[in-house]
């Protein structure tokens, strides 16, 4: 059930910049399986755990990182083809995707408390749009996808663009993500990083990557918002 913000709630200049997959929607493992299909179609065979370790970075970097592990090389055209195959495969898995516990309540709470927030994802709009619809996110919410920036995570471009769209300083922003790539990007952007365990990374990994706090999922973060700058006015 949605929690109502306390009377007198305020956020100052604090804004929240959310990753999408594994942070707001339970879609990481569907992406893993979709990537396995795409890679196998290209004659590249990898264990799913190796694929999982790279989820969260941009598709191009993702392909390069996995190919480095296997010793394969592909052309830019083939790398683009693998990304298209992934998007097609993910479309077949998306019916299994659900919002993570507390995701809708967390976003509704921040909206009611007038805390600005945006979504910044390394996914392209084709796959991200499928997940965004599950959350019922309104059209006026800034959504920054891989298509809109030069470099995706672990570069800071996505979060910098999201902060700019909100009209806030990146130093006044809290980046919420489930992967080490989210938190490395947050650190490089000079934002406060908060990790969630809902994407499969461990607490220590997220802390080493720069997480100020680590919570189980959006519902857990909602219960502890005062720890990251959203609190009652004194």
What is the predicted role of each segment?
Residues 2-52:
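Active-site neighborhood of HAD-like aspartate-dependent phosphohydrolases
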Residues 38, 58-74, 131, 162-163:
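Helix-loop "lid/cap" segments that line or gate small-molecule binding pockets
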Residues 45, 67-105, 113:
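Metal-dependent phosphoesterase signature
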Residues 104-111, 183-188:
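Surface-exposed amphipathic alpha-helices with a cationic face
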Residues 213-217:
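Short acidic-hydrophobic, aromatic-tinged amphipathic segments that line or gate anion-handling sites
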Residues 227-234:
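Short, basic, low-complexity termini and linkers enriched in Ser/Thr/Gly/Pro
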């Amino acid at each position: 059930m949605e929690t109502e913000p306390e009377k007198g709630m305020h956020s100052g200049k604090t804004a929240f910049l959310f990753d999408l997959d594994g942070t707001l929607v339970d879609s990481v493992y569907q992406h893993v399986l979709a990537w396995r299909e795409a890679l196998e179609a290209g004659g590249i065979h990898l264990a799913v755990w190796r694929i999982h370790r790279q989820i969260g970075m941009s598709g191009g970097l993702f392909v390069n990182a996995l190919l480095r592990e296997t010793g394969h090389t592909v052309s830019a055209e083939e790398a683009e083809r693998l990304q298209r195959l992934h998007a097609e495969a993910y479309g077949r898995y998306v019916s299994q995707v659900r919002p993570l516990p507390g995701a809708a309540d967390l976003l509704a709470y921040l909206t009611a408390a007038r805390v600005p927030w945006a979504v910044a994802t390394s996914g392209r709009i084709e796959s991200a749009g499928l997940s965004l619809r599950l959350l019922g996110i309104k059209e006026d919410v800034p959504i920054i996808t891989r298509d809109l920036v030069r470099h995706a995570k672990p570069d800071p471009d996505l979060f910098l663009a999201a902060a700019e769209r909100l009209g806030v300083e990146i130093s006044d922003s809290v980046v919420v993500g489930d992967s080490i790539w989210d938190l490395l990007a947050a650190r490089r952007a000079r934002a406060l990083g908060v990790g969630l365990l809902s994407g499969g990374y461990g607490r220590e990994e997220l802390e080493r990557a720069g997480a100020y706090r680590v919570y189980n999922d959006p519902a857990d973060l909602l219960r502890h918002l005062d720890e990251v700058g959203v609190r009652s006015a004194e």
